[in-house]
Amino acid sequence: LLNQKTAKYIPVHYVLSNYPHYEPSYYPHKPAVPVNNQYMPYPYYAKPVAVRPHVQIPQWQVLPNTYTPTVVRHPHLPASFIVIPPKKIQDKTGNPTINTIATAEPTLTPTTEPIVNTVVTTEASSEFTITSTPETTTVPVTSTMV
């Protein structure tokens, strides 16, 4: 709109009264001013709905010379985007001294226990296996005979 030249508004009745030969009687009345003129009412034509969007284009806006915000605003991201460093890396760097001390005590204690438990578990499992097999055999035979 800024680059377009606007025609001066001339009343239609003034043109018709002074220059009658412009409008013969067998033509319908049409205004002498262009239809897209913003100063002319639209009695005979439908007003155009939207030739251009009414939103200003950012290039045309006059911007101030100074930077208006005084405080730099950082965007607040949702919790899913916040990166939290994994604790495993921190534990690996901090635990080697603790792990060497801690592994000395459990190594001695479990080493003694599994040997005893393994022997006992093996004997117990073999006894239970042998015992359970005859009992299982005995119970079905007894229940079948009774």
From Swiss-Prot:
Mammary gland specific. Secreted in milk. InterPro entries: Casein_kappa (IPR000117). The keyword Secreted applies. Glycans are attached at residues 97, 107, 112, 118, 125, 142. It holds the Pfam family Casein_kappa. Signal peptide: none annotated. Keywords: Glycoprotein, Milk protein, Phosphoprotein, Secreted. It comes from the Eukaryota. The modification Phosphoserine is found at residues 125, 143. It is found in: Secreted. Belongs to the kappa-casein family. This is Kappa-casein. The lineage of its organism: Eukaryota, Metazoa, Chordata, Craniata, Vertebrata.
